[in-house]
A protein has these predicted regions:
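Membrane-interface "cap" regions at the ends of multi-pass membrane proteins
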Residues: 1-64, 76, 201, 225-236, ...
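Hydrophobic, membrane-embedded alpha-helices of multi-pass small-molecule transporters
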Residues: 34-51, 166-173, 207-211, 221-285, ...
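Selective recognition of specific alpha-helical transmembrane segments in multi-pass small-molecule
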Residues: 47-50, 73-81, 116-128, 195-209, ...
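Juxtamembrane transmembrane-helix boundary signature
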Residues: 71-104, 116-130, 285-289, 325, ...
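Transmembrane alpha-helical segments of multi-pass small-molecule transport proteins
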Residues: 113-114, 140-179, 195-204, 231-250, ...
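Hydrophobic alpha-helical segments and their helix-loop junctions in multi-pass secondary transporters
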Residues: 129, 133-142, 195-221, 239-243, ...
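Membrane-interface loop-to-helix entry segments
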Residues: 130-133, 165-209, 267-271, 379-388, ...
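C-terminal membrane-solvent junction of multi-pass transporters and transport-like membrane proteins
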Residues: 390-473, 477, 484-488
Length: 493
């Protein structure tokens, strides 16, 4: 469980031209303790997109106990993903972009790096920012009455002027926070969490009170009950997909661990306790306001707006946006910047790559991706189809194929060298990734094929299982073939 000594190799790898951001962390640069890992996601779990996701569960027919079970099961799965996929990072001090090379090859790692850093990172940044911008509309309308009536008739690719202005403001805040550096981010994560919890818990208590207490909330029954347990599994998978990005690139955080137990204790402790509280506050706020005010489609922003006190509404929405911003910075801009730096070190720094991600996140017109529950779950299916297979391959590669041991010299290679795989590509891993992605996503386009449709609805979990099984079988088959070939050669000799 110890940490490898990479100090001797550091200068050698640095001489090859690798940027400081992607070199293995030496003991001097490992500055995160258990408390940092406990708090890193504590505020981020309370973000508007997560509340929208859980609101969708009630629309799909889940009862209050079923929603709470879905949240708790998702927390356990995400925590396990953090610990397992973060193990190599804390042991060797390397981040996601370089860890990928051990599984996919020096050049083959480009495929999953682009999936996580560019495609998914861009989409996630855009969607979370536009959701935050919509809540900013409510905030600004409270502060500046008539804000939503500015420039009537304005339409920019489907975006009205007030929302566009709110989007730009939140975009600048998010990117500016990231450009402040890791120390600023660490302080932000550490001190924003208590603020978020104070106001979220307060709002939940208010909602439970106006609904008449816990009794009516737990007795609440959806208008249309859940069709079958596959819907429940799909809901769990949607929540896991929401955290699929951090699961994939958790090594970017665990590489900074002062000691091995810091992330192994801190990440599960922070995620599980935070998610249990998230489940309670989310259910209390959504169901409480539904009972008291009949909020349509469990709209969380509309629910908060029912508080009546303008100051309370503003502060609570700001608190939720702090959580969303924390997630976007740590879960999207940071990994996207690191991946692009690893792919094109002469063209990008972490900060310039993150700015590109933020710009592209706007170019994709994210406001068209979150215009309803169906669109949101299609989004989860898409990103889960990428995150799940990547996670499965990485876990099998490190724990089964490599037995938790890495050769950093085959990862940090000299310019022009390909490492341990022919032409720098692990064809088996890349092939399994593509096949798993196609199988997992195909149900979204073939809804009349029940098996594929159900696989797609649980994209992250399905993709991870499919890729794990396929890659493990491929490894066992290749290993058996190699042994047979050696035995045949020995007999001939």
């Amino acid at each position: 469980m110890g940490q490898a000594n990479v100090k001797e190799s550091y200068e050698e790898f640095k001489s090859y031209g690798y940027a400081d951001d992607i070199l293995p962390k030496t003991s001097e640069n490992r500055d995160w303790g258990t408390f940092n890992y406990v708090t890193v996601w504590m505020g981020a779990v309370h973000n508007l997109m997560s509340y929208m996701t859980v609101a969708g569960f009630f629309v799909l027919g889940l009862s209050v106990p079923q929603v709470l079970w879905a949240v708790m099961i998702a927390a356990l799965i995400v925590s396990a993903g953090y610990v397992l996929n973060g193990y190599a990072g804390q042991k060797y001090g390397i981040g996601y972009s370089m860890l990928l090379r051990s599984s996919f090859g020096v050049k083959g790692s480009i495929i999953p790096a682009i999936c996580r850093g560019l495609i998914a990172g861009v989409v996630f940044f855009g969607t979370k920012t536009i959701i935050g911008a919509q809540s900013f509309n409510v905030i600004f309308e409270k502060i500046f009455p008539g804000y939503m009536n500015m420039v009537p008739g304005f339409d920019f690719l489907g975006l009205d002027f007030p929302t566009m202005l709110s989007y730009v403001i939140l975009w600048v805040i998010t990117v500016g926070l990231f450009l402040g550096g890791m120390k600023i981010l660490s302080l932000f994560s550490k001190w924003s969490s208590p603020i978020i919890y104070i106001f979220i818990v307060g709002a939940a208590i208010w909602a439970i009170s106006v609904a008449g207490g816990f009794g009516p909330i737990f007795a609440y029954a959806p208008a249309k009950p859940m069709e079958n347990w596959l819907v429940f599994i799909a809901c769990v998978s949607a929540l896991v997909s929401n955290w699929g990005g951090p699961i994939v690139n958790i090594a970017d955080l665990t590489q900074r661990a002062k000691h091995p137990k810091a992330p192994m204790i801190g990440l599960p402790l922070g995620m599980i306790t935070s998610y249990i509280l998230f489940g309670i506050t989310c259910v209390g706020l959504l169901v409480g306001t539904q009972i008291a005010f009949g909020i349509k489609d469990f709209n969380v922003v509309a629910a908060i707006d029912q508080i009546g006190n303008p100051v309370a509404v503003i502060v609570l929405l700001l608190a939720l946006n702090i959580g969303s911003t924390s997630y976007v910075v740590f879960g999207n801009l940071l990994p996207s910047g690191l991946q692009m730096t690893a792919l094109l070190p002469k063209m990008f720094t972490v900060k310039s790559a993150a700015i590109l991600t933020a710009l592209l996140g706007t170019v994709i017109l994210p406001w068209k991706l979150v215009n309803g529950t169906a669109a949101l779950y299609m989004f989860y299916s898409f990103i889960g189809s990428m995150y799940g297979p990547i996670t499965g391959i990485m876990l099998v590669s490190f724990f089964i194929e490599r037995k938790r041991k890495l050769d950093l010299s085959s990862i940090y290679v000299k310019p022009g060298e390909n490492g341990e795989y022919k032409n720098g590509v692990n064809m088996v891993a890349c092939g399994v990734l593509i096949v798993s992605f196609l199988i997992t996503l195909s149900g979204s386009f073939l809804p009349n094929v029940p098996l594929l449709a159900n696989i797609s609805k649980s994209a992250f979990l399905s993709g991870m299982i499919i890729s794990s099984v396929l890659y493990a079988l491929s490894y066992k088959w290749n290993k058996s073939s190699a042994i047979t070939q050696r035995e045949t050669t020995a007999k001939v000799s």
